[in-house]
């Protein structure tokens, strides 16, 4: 039970972090969403062998972590939870692309390894920025920003319900695991048959509880429309935040600054 609640479904911490009062938290949600979108588009548009050109993009997530007071250890744990998906995508690249593209002293590095590390780096940056966006904005505020930016309301409401009902699923799963632990000998005897039965009961119990929650929402006047906690208003300095970072991302995208600096240093040394 503790593993379910604290290791994999530790989503309540995000909401707690989002209630802080920092410069990043005070930014309009739409500004943060647009800046994150520009960042993600620029990062994923690089070629498979580009690594040095990606490094300057680390400035933005590090800026958000420091200024937004986001716990770095917590963020890295959440990124690592999804890391196996990126590893599975690029794990066979070193076997498929064996042409040596880079030498580090006597050690030759093939294009497959370079592309593999490029996939991991892009994954960590994009997922990290998405998590920081939620941690410094709040899930409800992100959904409100999407709705104000023209995303279909049906889709936004589904995202909100997914977030809310995930807590319901975790609560029901915790109850079932606790009940099973109390009725078994040190948690033994979890066969596939028992696991399948528990999964089926979990689905039925979650659907039943979600239906009761929906009925309660209708009784309280829910009509499918999202209502912000406070009005959204973009200020001039927030527009400068968006334009400044977007200009930085585009500059780093079209100019390989680390390579230019390396060439410049070699010229001075020689």
Predicted feature descriptions by range:
Residues 78-185:
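Juxtamembrane/interface alpha-helical elements of multi-pass membrane proteins
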Residues 59-69, 83-88:
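Alpha-helical transmembrane segments and their membrane-interface exit regions
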Residues 1-49, 56-66, 171-270:
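Transmembrane alpha-helix interface motif
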Residues 69-76:
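Membrane-interface helix-boundary motifs at transmembrane edges
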């Amino acid at each position: 039970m503790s593993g379910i609640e604290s290791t994999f479904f530790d989503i309540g911490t995000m909401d707690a972090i989002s209630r802080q009062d920092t410069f990043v938290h005070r930014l309009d949600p739409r500004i943060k969403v647009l800046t994150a979108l520009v960042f993600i588009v620029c990062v994923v548009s690089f070629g498979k062998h580009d690594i040095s050109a990606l490094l300057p993009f680390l400035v933005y997530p590090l800026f958000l972590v420091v200024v937004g007071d986001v716990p770095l250890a917590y963020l890295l744990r959440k990124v690592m939870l999804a890391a196996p998906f990126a590893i599975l995508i690029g794990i066979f690249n070193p076997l498929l692309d064996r042409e040596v593209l880079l030498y580090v002293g006597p050690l030759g590095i093939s294009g497959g390894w370079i592309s593999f590390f490029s996939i991991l780096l892009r994954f960590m940056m994009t997922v990290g920025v998405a998590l920081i966006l939620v941690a410094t904005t709040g899930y409800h505020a992100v959904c409100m920003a999407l709705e104000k930016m023209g995303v279909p309301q049906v889709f936004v409401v589904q995202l909100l319900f997914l977030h809310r009902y995930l807590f319901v699923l975790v609560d029901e799963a915790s109850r079932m695991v606790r009940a099973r632990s109390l009725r078994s000998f040190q948690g033994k005897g979890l066969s596939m048959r028992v696991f399948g039965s528990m999964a089926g009961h979990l689905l039925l119990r979650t659907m039943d509880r979600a239906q009761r929650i929906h009925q309660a929402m209708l009784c309280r006047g829910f009509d499918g429309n999202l209502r912000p906690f406070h009005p959204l208003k973009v200020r001039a300095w927030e527009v400068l935040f968006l334009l400044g970072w977007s200009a930085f991302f585009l500059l780093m995208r079209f100019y390989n600054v680390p390579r230019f600096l390396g060439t410049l240093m070699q010229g001075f040394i020689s």
